[in-house]
Amino acid sequence: MSQSRHRAAAPPMEREDSGTFSLGKMITAKPGKTPIQVLHEYGMKTKNIPVYECERSDVQIHVPTFTFRVTVGDITCTGEGTSKKLAKHRAAEAAINILKANASICFAVPDPLMPDPSKQPKNQLNPIGSLQELAIHHGWRLPEYTLSQEGGPAHKREYTTICRLESFMETGKGASKKQAKRNAAEKFLAKFSNISPENHISLTNMVGHSLGCTWHSLRNSPGEKINLLKRSLLSIPNTDYIQLLSEIAKEQGFNITYLDIEELSANGQYQCLAELSTSPITVCHGSGISCSSAQSDAAHNALQYLKIIAERK
C-alpha cells in the first residue's frame, strides 16, 4: 500500500528537448533498475535528491510492517511493506508514478517476507535475523546458538545446533553449521507464528517472567538444598553430584542440559558441558574416563560455581 500527497503542483517532468531528459526513457533504457535507483538518478539530474524517512516500524510476531516517506522536490509519497527495503521501494515507485503522471508504470517489487513456499528458495530468507528482530522488539534476550553435535562421514557431515530464547529451546540440523543454525531459528519462527494474536501478550508475559534463577535470587534463597550446598565441602567420596545438582535445579527453578563433546581431551579423556538455564546462563566443563564420569565432573564443577555465587554478599 502506498499513499502520496503534493505540497504544490508538480512541474512537468518529461521534456524531450536537448539538455534535458525523459524519465520515461530513463526507465525504459534501464529496466533492471529498482524504483529507488531510478528515483535517485532522477534526483541527481534535477538536483532534488530523494529524502527517505521511516514513519512507522511495527514489528509484530506474524508480519512486521514498515512505512517510509520519500520527498522529492515538491512531491511527498509514502509506501508500506513487510521490510524497510520494500517500504522504501513502494514509496519510490509511488513518487515515480506521480512524476510520470501515469499510474500504469509499475515496478514489480516482490515481498520477501510473504513468499510462495513452493517457489521461494530457502537461502533468500533470513530466519536468524528475523528471530533476532523479534527478540529485540519484545525486549527478550537475544537468541543463543550452541553447536551440540557434529557427525557423519567427511563427505556428508551433519551438524546439530541448539537455539535458546529465554526459556524456549529448539534444535536444528543441517549439512553445515550455518544451515543447522538457520533451521533452529526457522523452528522458533514457526512456533511463534502458530500463536494467535490474542495470545501475544500472554506469550510476552510468560517469556518476561521466565528468567528463572538469577544470582540475586540464588544468594537470597531460603531453599534447603542451596543452603546445604553453602555448607558442603563438595569433596566427600561417592557423592552423586548429578543428583545433587538436579535437586538444586528443581528447587531453584532452572534446567540442566548435558552436552557430550565428541572429541577427546588432550590427555585422552571424555568431555562434557553442563549448561544451566540460570540468568545469566552457566556453562561448566567436565572430563573423565567415560561419558558418565565426564558428566559427573561437569556437575561437580557447576556445583562449585553455584556455591561460590550463593556465598557472595
UniProtKB/Swiss-Prot annotation:
The keyword Phosphoprotein applies. GO terms for biological process: middle ear morphogenesis; outer ear morphogenesis; protein phosphorylation; regulation of regulatory ncRNA processing; siRNA processing; skeletal system morphogenesis. The modification Phosphoserine is found at residues 18, 167, 246, 287. Residues 1-103, 102-195, 195-313 are annotated as: Sufficient for self-association and interaction with TARBP2. Keywords: Cytoplasm, Phosphoprotein, Repeat, RNA-binding, RNA-mediated gene silencing. GO terms for molecular function: double-stranded RNA binding; siRNA binding. Residues 34-101, 126-194, 240-308 form the DRBM domain. Phosphorylated at Ser-246 in unstressed cells and at Ser-287 in stressed cells. Phosphorylation at Ser-246 appears to be a prerequisite for subsequent phosphorylation at Ser-287. Phosphorylation at Ser-246 and Ser-287 are necessary for activation of EIF2AK2/PKR under conditions of stress. InterPro entries: dsRBD_dom, PRKRA_DSRM_1, PRKRA_DSRM_2, PRKRA_DSRM_3, RLC_Component. Its main location: cytoplasm. It is found in: Cytoplasm, Perinuclear region; Cytoplasm. GO terms for cellular component: cytoplasm; intracellular anatomical structure; nucleus; perinuclear region of cytoplasm; RISC complex; RISC-loading complex. PROSITE patterns: DS_RBD. Residues 1-21 are annotated as: Disordered. Disulfide bonds: none annotated. It holds the Pfam family dsrm. The keyword Cytoplasm applies. Self-association may occur via interactions between DRBM domains as follows: DRBM 1/DRBM 1, DRBM 1/DRBM 2, DRBM 2/DRBM 2 or DRBM 3/DRBM3. Homodimer. Interacts with EIF2AK2/PKR through its DRBM domains. Interacts with DICER1, AGO2 and TARBP2. Also able to interact with dsRNA. Interacts with UBC9. Forms a complex with UBC9 and p53/TP53. Interacts with DUS2L (via DRBM domain). Activates EIF2AK2/PKR in the absence of double-stranded RNA (dsRNA), leading to phosphorylation of EIF2S1/EFI2-alpha and inhibition of translation and induction of apoptosis. Required for siRNA production by DICER1 and for subsequent siRNA-mediated post-transcriptional gene silencing. Does not seem to be required for processing of pre-miRNA to miRNA by DICER1. Promotes UBC9-p53/TP53 association and sumoylation and phosphorylation of p53/TP53 at 'Lys-386' at 'Ser-392' respectively and enhances its activity in a EIF2AK2/PKR-dependent manner. Belongs to the PRKRA family. PANTHER family: INTERFERON-INDUCIBLE DOUBLE-STRANDED RNA-DEPENDENT PROTEIN KINASE ACTIVATOR A, LOQUACIOUS, ISOFORM B. This is Interferon-inducible double-stranded RNA-dependent protein kinase activator A. The gene is PRKRA.
